[in-house]
Structures are given as C-alpha cells and as structure tokens.
From Swiss-Prot:
Cited SMART domains: KOW
Protein name stated in the entry: Large ribosomal subunit protein uL24
GO CC entries: large ribosomal subunit
Record-level GO BP terms: translation
C-alpha cells in the first residue's frame, strides 16, 4: 500500500536516486510545439530554449545551459546575478516554472521517444469516448 501522507511523499522525492530524478525535471511544451509534436510535456535538456512563467523574471527567454538533477533546477543562459565580489552566477529556476519554446532535436533517441509518446497519447484518446475526453 502506498502512503498518502505528505511528509512521506516529500521524503520519497528527497531520497529519490539520481537516475530517476529526470522524471521530476519535466516541463510543458509551448502551444505551437504541442501541436507540432502531439505531446504536452517532456524532460528538460541542455540546449532547449525555455520561457519563464513564474517569479520576478517572468517572460524571460533563453537557452538551458545546465540541468541540476539533484536540486531539480535549470540554469538559463543570460539569467545571472552578481555575487558580493562581482562574479556572475546563474539564477537556478525550478523546472516546473518554465515552458519549453524550442526543443533540442539533435538527439535521434529523444526524437524516437517523442514519437513513442505521441503514439501512446493518440492510442489512449482514440479508445476514450468523446464524452469522456472533455
């Protein structure tokens, strides 16, 4: 039996192994990408272009420079702040606070995964009746 206690759910996330943390690093696709690829969300990768949807920098667009699986956050090109000594450091943003505006399509395996997800989604919605979908 799986617990529904919030404290145990948080503990599960905190103690999750690194090779499973990529599942927490998913973000929605923009509307035009959603129509183009037929999926709603995908894991964020270095090289994707994203747009901030929450926080003080809302609307900022840039390329993902680094992904920190342990903290579940991404660094975006150009989104920096200065330390006390003047050196710039990245502002780390939680993956759920961004929308992917352009995918890095250089990896064939990723494109195969997108195609797999699209087919599964189409299959799922084709089985449901029109009344259940809406």
């Amino acid at each position: 039996m799986i617990s529904s206690k919030p404290s145990k759910q948080r503990k599960l996330v905190y103690n999750l192994p690194n090779h499973l943390r990529y599942k927490l690093l998913t973000a929605r696709l923009s509307e035009d990408l959603e129509k183009q690829y037929g999926i709603k969300r995908i894991s964020i990768r270095k090289g994707d272009s994203v747009k901030l949807m929450r926080g003080s920098q809302v609307g900022y667009e840039g390329k993902v420079v680094e992904v920190d699986r342990k903290r579940g956050r991404v660094a975006i090109e150009g989104l920096t702040k200065k330390k006390a000594d003047g050196t710039p450091v990245y502002v780390w943003v939680h993956a759920s606070k961004v929308i992917i505006t352009k995918l890095d399509t250089g990896d064939k395996e990723r494109m195969d995964a997108i195609e797999r997800k699209r087919k599964m989604r189409e299959e799922y919605f084709s089985k449901k009746s029109p009344k259940e979908v809406s």
